[in-house]
Amino acid sequence: MKAIQQIANGEFEDWKIDAIKAEKCRQFDLEMESNEDKAMILMNAFYNEQDLGDILNYKDKIMAITTDDIKRVAKKYLSDNYLALYIEKGKPDKNAKIEKPGYKPVEPPIGKESLYATQFKNLPIGQMEEKFAGYGEVQIKQLNDRSKMYYTPNKENNVFQLVVQYGAGEREFPKLGYAAQLMNNAGIMGAYEPQELKEELSKLNATCHVTADDDNLYIIMEGYEATLPQACQLLSRQILMPKLDEKQLARLKGSAMGMRQQRKDNVSILNEALRQYMLYGEKSDYIKELTDKEIYELQISELTGDINRASNYEAKVFFTGTLPLRPSIRYPEQEPPIGGQRTPVQLPHRQRT
């Protein structure tokens, strides 16, 4: 309630409102890239009898929201006059029987079609011209002796996506998966604490996600191209000098150990472990994974080192945006540290037994 009162009093920074509005607009742009999401929007508009014009003007409505609007809504709907509902888990009475409702179920007429079904079938269907992805649009640029950039123009909006794929994963660095998870809450040594870096990225309306699999380390950034240079600079500094958090590492260890305790009783996980052993033998993920002792002894210094070493491997950079691929343009690949001058990609090599 204290936080709600602060919102009602306007005790927040203006940039946070701007960041939230920009994020919502970016998410709407991404939804409009997806045929599935657009179909869901049309479906919701249809059965809620919404005006499509209002939906298409969503971004204008979001950007028109002011600080006074937020304070007004908080005071009106988030006041002390509220109803709290608490739910507790109980034990049902095994002998109790649920009574049948006191009304008869609606039985549709057999062999007849409802008025709604008739109207729906008679709705006009327009003709659509399919636009398939053209792989010929992908342009390839050599970054160094081993690393390349794959560029695809974004013809839909001004949202960019930058994916840096380093050619080394958990097979080469078994602890890299934990290091990647910590990178999602990391700062920059000597510059930003984790929360401060998140705020800086929010101001730029950019998001960054790090993950790893057996063969690669992935760094994925999305945002609007207007702030692409600044976002790439922060990303580059974070990769080169990550400041991993000890508290996050402690939580990660606890979560990993807790999940291992639970999976012993999970039939689906046991089934998957058996399947992997039948396919891969001693190379099964469940056999290769870190031991409990190794997880308990994880250190920030070694995880930071794994990120540094993995980012020195051969890389592929995938960029989708509106920036033209010309020598006169400063490209996003000039910001993230691209290794590969000395270390080639580690090819997948797990085979079935």
Task: Please report, for each region that a protein language model flagged, where it lies by residue.
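M16 family metallopeptidases and their MPP-like homologs
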Residues: 1-63, 84-88, 96-97, 150-185, ...
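Peptidyl-prolyl cis-trans isomerase
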Residues: 241-250, 295-300
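Proteolytic maturation boundary segments
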Residues: 29, 53-165, 313-353
